[in-house]
Amino acid sequence: MAAGVAAWLPFARAAAIGWMPVANCPMPLAPADKNKRQDELIVLNVSGRRFQTWRTTLERYPDTLLGSTEKEFFFNEDTKEYFFDRDPEVFRCVLNFYRTGKLHYPRYECISAYDDELAFYGILPEIIGDCCYEEYKDRKRENAERLMDDNDSENNQESMPSLSFRQTMWRAFENPHTSTLALVFYYVTGFFIAVSVITNVVETVPCGTVPGSKELPCGERYSVAFFCLDTACVMIFTVEYLLRLFAAPSRYRFIRSVMSIIDVVAIMPYYIGLVMTNNEDVSGAFVTLRVFRVFRIFKFSRHSQGLRILGYTLKSCASELGFLLFSLTMAIIIFATVMFYAEKGSSASKFTSIPASFWYTIVTMTTLGYGDMVPKTIAGKIFGSICSLSGVLVIALPVPVIVSNFSRIYHQNQRADKRRAQKKARLARIRVAKTGSSNAYLHSKRNGLLNEALELTGTPEEEQMGKTTSLIESQHHHLLHCLEKTTGLSYLVDDPLLSVRTSTIKNHEFIDEQMFEQNCMESSMQNYPSTRSPSLSSHSGLTTTCCSRRSKKTTHLPNSNLPATRLRSMQELSTLHIQGSEQPSLTTSRSSLNLKADDGLRPNCKTSQITTAIISIPTPPALTPEGESRPPPASPGPNTNIPSITSNVVKVSAL
């Protein structure tokens, strides 16, 4: 048995690893290559970003641009690809829609730009996935509300020259700040609204007793004065209503509006009182009708942005308010019924009927608790507690929604006002720029350039130059003046804070640069003045005249206190060799290009020079590696020489 196992075991192992086939029949053929052909792979170039996909992927939606034959208009024969000059970031979402069948909205994209891209590719926004559709609709609604006022203002401003008299009047009523007359009428109507409301309140106040009569209110005691005030207010309100009705774009819509109804209700009691007789039967109805005069206070909504925002909030929260009213109605009916049957057995109970129990339920659910109706039984007290707790929950749930809507609308109005103010300021600046001449613009430009230069330098010489010459000419001359000094001479500046070495070259080559840096460090200075030393461009000895260009000439500045040996050593450390440079004329310089005719200089622009400036900035001894080994500096005195310190070398090349 063991011998038989040993005989076939190697063959089984060999077959397992593929050395010997186990089956005698041949293996079936491999499946045919079902991959897509190479010509079905298309390239979509969107603003330089290349996307590759299969043609059948795009043909899934033939009603769109990429799925129809219209995309052939965008085919480039040279590159063999479809080119679209569109946003590549949004196209990524579009291409994923063709691949997966689900359209998503990226939150970082502008909603208007996203809609434009979808409209270009022929994709409906309604097919956005459920995961992104709510976010898309919210962003779209917020954007529409934010831009509504801006579009209205733009349309009004664009059509201002062609406005008729009625349109101008309506625009003045809706936006009083368009003209002075509209603003005056706006404040006059606001004043009379306040007077009317105060009159309606004060006329009910008792004004004392008259001998032989009972106490009378002020409205009856001073009836003539109050009648005149009421007449004046009603006349103003009537004129305003008639003018608004005349100027309204749609009179039918204006009459149906809420503010129009408030205006009619506010002035109607006065005219009804004029035509009514002194009949006692109708006097009660007239008194009831006078109550509607209090609606004049709602006319303040035209003069208060906060009241308008509150009205918009209540209008936008109509569904939440309807839910609140429905919930309260259900709870009131349920708890009023329960309280009636719970207190029915008590003899001193005030819950005589279910409608009578409504009052207790409303007061309890709104957490007022007047105490005029109180349950006496144990069951009534328990149900009263449950009624109070349920009222808190029912009322508190819709309140955050209302508050959030109010905050949203308020901030939108704030941003709209800010945008209108910014746009008004921009239009004013553009108007000034258009009305101003080109010379005025150039003059302001020159002033701006000179102010920037004076802020950087702040030297008296430049200020004097700006006063005597043209601003741009002065700056250009100053630039060429500095360039001439740099290209014409090789300076060794003994400034304690700044050392500059320049040389003029045409054909140059660099030599031992490390040796130059080492020697330049050894030749730095250590005396630090209390004030900032002037630069080459602002030195008194250099700004008044233009120096001639000489090759490899060294000038020692007045504030130098280096010994002659050190000056000689720094002269020998030039990193640039001049090969075959011509000596320019001593009377010609680049700065003479902008000099006046009386300077007597002729321009010479035949040669071009390359300038290399080596700027050495000294560093304190404590910051240098060998600062610790050097002796401390002696106290300064009249005959004391301060040793030099190590410096950092910065090379600057300029044309």
Curated annotation (Swiss-Prot):
Intramembrane sections: 353-366, 367-374
Keyword hit for Cell membrane: yes
* Skewed-composition ranges (Polar residues): 637-655
Keyword Lyase assigned to the entry: answer is: no
Q: Which residues bind Zn(2+)?
A: H104, C110, C131, C132
Question: Which Gene3D superfamilies has this protein been placed in?
Answer: 1.10.287.70, Potassium Channel Kv1.1, Chain A, Voltage-gated potassium channels. Chain C
Span list, region Interaction with KCNIP1: 70-78
Q: How are the domains described in the entry?
A: Two N-terminal domains regulate binding to and modulation by KCNIP1.
Outline the segment boundaries, as ranges, of region: Interaction with KCNIP1 and KCNIP2: 6-21, 470-487
- Its name, as the record gives it, is A-type voltage-gated potassium channel KCND3
Species lineage, top-down? Eukaryota, Metazoa, Chordata, Craniata, Vertebrata
What is this entry's stated membrane topology?
Answer: Multi-pass membrane protein
